[in-house]
Amino acid sequence: MTKVGLRIDVDTFRGTREGVPRLLETLSKYNIQASIFFSVGPDNMGRHLWRLVKPQFLWKMLRSNAASLYGWDILLAGTAWPGKEIGHANADIIREAAKHHEVGLHAWDHHAWQAHSGNWDRQTMVDDIARGLRTLEEIIGQPVTCSAAAGWRADQQVIEAKEAFHLRYNSDCRGAMPFRPLLESGKPGTAQIPVTLPTWDEVIGRDVKAEDFNGWLLNRILRDKGTPVYTIHAEVEGCAYQHNFVDLLKRAAQEGVTFCPLSELLSETLPLGQVVRGNIAGREGWLGCQQIAGSR
């Protein structure tokens, strides 16, 4: 039996309003629990359109057929008008998710974090995280114990900023296995549970065809030598490619693959490491990557 952490990122208003209820229904049908990370502030995702001037981002949008994948409402959100606030407008949906699944913070403003957090000072970052956590806790009526940085935009600054909130774990980077990042003080920080597997949009049209994706992914899962963690998006697997996700769950069960919330992957003792800026094939720009302590 292979155990895989299932992380669901919710980036947008439509992903929350339409994608999450569909995913909740699917997960209930297959008796699966996951970790769901919500963006709760304004939906300004359309402001990423300026990145089309960057060849790597443009190619990603073209090969993944982004207009069909996400829809024009997502691609234009927050461009010619202020972005709609996601959290309180979809509070019932978020509360329903929290009844059955592990719920954490993805971002206050997903676009702002992904586009600008790399240049923020620490206090700006702490204030932004606090605003998101406060809003999510108001909605679900209980403490939030985990978070996942939007777009995996994380480095030492993010690690230090999140220590102020005493979360159980964060999932801010890409890597191979859970670990504790070293703080500037030399002490181990809050556990990190990295994503180990590629997302749909990172590989479609580059490494694999859409119709072959599930078999390709299951092969990667079964060959994973670390602690497999897979991320889906409410805007993709909860909307245009929900049928593909359902097929993945069916095939995974046949292969002896089970999915679980990320917290079930934690253990009493974890290796030490760091979160450093790096690059991942198929994704434009830098993102946080696991580095084992002592390696370079």
Swiss-Prot record:
GO cellular component: membrane
Similarity annotation: Belongs to the polysaccharide deacetylase family. ArnD deformylase subfamily.
Pfam families, sorted: Polysacc_deac_1 (PF01522)
Cross-referenced SUPFAM superfamilies: Glycoside hydrolase/deacetylase
One Gene Ontology MF term: hydrolase activity, acting on carbon-nitrogen (but not peptide) bonds, in linear amides
Ranges of residues in domain NodB homology: 2-260
A GO BP entry: response to antibiotic
Keywords: Antibiotic resistance, Hydrolase, Lipid A biosynthesis, Lipid biosynthesis, Lipid metabolism, Lipopolysaccharide biosynthesis
Name of the protein described by the UniProt record: Probable 4-deoxy-4-formamido-L-arabinose-phosphoundecaprenol deformylase ArnD
